[in-house]
Amino acid sequence: MDPTLISLGALALAGAAATVSGCAEDLESDVGSQSNPNSQVQLGPQMGNIHRYFNKAISGEPVSYGLYVAVAGTIAWALINAGLNVVLAIIVGAGVAAIVHGAYSVSAFLGRTVGQSKKFGQPVYMDVLTSHIGPIVGHGFIAVFTMTLAAYLATTALGNPFPLPLVSLIFGITVGAIGSSTGDVHYGAEREYQKYPFGGGIPVANQGDIDIYAEYGVRNGLDSSYFCSRFGGPLTGLCFGLIIFLDGWRSILGNIIGGDLVTKTSIALLVGLLVVAVAAVINRKLEVYARNKYGPYRN
């Protein structure tokens, strides 16, 4: 079979895996309230809002997912070199990473909540711990498995020269950064502040004054994940999937058109710059259109 067709198929599969990974990563952080929105959850009890959110800011998402995917990639790499089937090796690696993820989540939830119990009256709800840890670990497993699969495809079919553990680390940091900057806005700026007018941002005076009641009953992290699965999660997946796909596509295009190594590299760089320029123009047009159509925010 033509090597170019194999590369295109591997790239399509890696892009699909990255899309699923980005979506699962964002929804996991919504269940556990990690990264940017967690500061608002942490401030909630200090503002008199006793809540039932799962509070687990282990670290920023880029750092934590860099760790999880690197653990999975390292274990998978060792097992593959030992002769184990590739899919089984990635599953085992993602399973170990899920256990690490769960251990950090439990310790972070208990530690951060207990730290606020005496002074601000925030209880440790054990049912919140038991009901949220499953979705956290489950979404995390899906994200890590698909991310490790994309990293494996990058190191084999797509010609990435670096070893699987290093590529896994880089991909984990990337997906965490995208989830933190893209999907978490839907949770932290919208879901946590639905009692305020839409579009007003989060003024300093409102920080920590989060919603503690849902459409029915008291709100928790599972409600947040359900809400964000309609927009924030898919948008994160689409963003990361496009990054993986377009980055691989420019390299493949350079290999097809170019002759020597310098020409291939130059074409790949030019195509990458063209993609960035087109994306910047589209973003600018969209922002101007939205501002002209809806106008400035008015309370």
Swiss-Prot record:
It is an enzyme of class 7 (translocase). Its EC number is 7.2.1.4. It is found in: Cell membrane. It holds the Pfam family MtrE. Keywords: Cell membrane, Membrane, Methanogenesis, Methyltransferase, One-carbon metabolism, Transferase, Translocase, Transmembrane, Transmembrane helix. InterPro entries: MeTrfase_E. It catalyses: 5-methyl-5,6,7,8-tetrahydromethanopterin + coenzyme M + 2 Na(+)(in) = 5,6,7,8-tetrahydromethanopterin + methyl-coenzyme M + 2 Na(+)(out). One of its GO terms (biological process) is one-carbon metabolic process. One of its GO terms (molecular function) is tetrahydromethanopterin S-methyltransferase activity. Pathway: One-carbon metabolism; methanogenesis from CO(2); methyl-coenzyme M from 5,10-methylene-5,6,7,8-tetrahydromethanopterin: step 2/2. The chain crosses the membrane at residues 57-79, 89-111, 132-154, 164-183, 227-246, 261-283. Its main location: membrane. It is a multi-pass membrane protein. GO terms for cellular component: cytoplasm; plasma membrane; vesicle membrane. Belongs to the MtrE family. Part of a complex that catalyzes the formation of methyl-coenzyme M and tetrahydromethanopterin from coenzyme M and methyl-tetrahydromethanopterin. This is an energy-conserving, sodium-ion translocating step. The complex is composed of 8 subunits; MtrA, MtrB, MtrC, MtrD, MtrE, MtrF, MtrG and MtrH. This is Tetrahydromethanopterin S-methyltransferase subunit E. It comes from Methanococcus maripaludis (strain DSM 14266 / JCM 13030 / NBRC 101832 / S2 / LL).
